[in-house]
Amino acid sequence: MPKDIQKYFKSYLKDKDSLKIIKSNTKEYNLIMGLLNTYGVLSYDKFYEMFNNIISCDKEYLFDRLTILNNFYGEFELYFSKKEKYVCNKAILKEKGIQLKDIKKYVNKKSNYKTFSSKELTSMFSYKYMSKFKSFKKMLSFVKKNYYLDEKDIRVFYKYVIIPYLNDVQIDNPTKEDNLSKNIDKYFEYKNEKHKNKFMDLVKGIINEAPMWKYNGYSEIEKEKGIVWNK
């Protein structure tokens, strides 16, 4: 990067107003992705209702933000027809035979969503929500014992290893274990086959406690306890 541009960015990051904008944008992004990783597909009205309960805004503002973030990150989809509008976790579209026009079949008609606090929803995409569970703590303890990780590394690990695996499980991707092995190997080096299997087992172990969009935000454990959800 040219030195004059580096100098500009350094000064930008020191500016208080700029830092406020960055903080606000990050919170919006984390909430958007937190909602979609928790609930999968939402009608635009429902998505706006949930978003507005935490970050107050009008519908036009939210639509603009969604459009900008979708164009930049490409992590979700917006579906609009003459009668219907949906916001969709892009991972769902990886399920065999599913196209964007079919996405309404995933919408929860009964609206029996699990409710979370604003803090939980804004931390859902950054691993903080999962960090309270024993299975996640056990997995993270193993990783920290074998590798050096700082806060940024943990966020990257969660976003690019844990979340893709959770999504693969929910769409029953036949290559989910192979994908998990490859994704781990991108960021960590396996010591041996035993170490690899232990690492993968610990990641797979968090599935039972993780919120699932296919269960409207409830976990596998909650489902087995008889929590009602809309398939």
Model feature map: region roles:
Residues 1-231:
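Acidic/negatively charged segments and metal-coordination signatures
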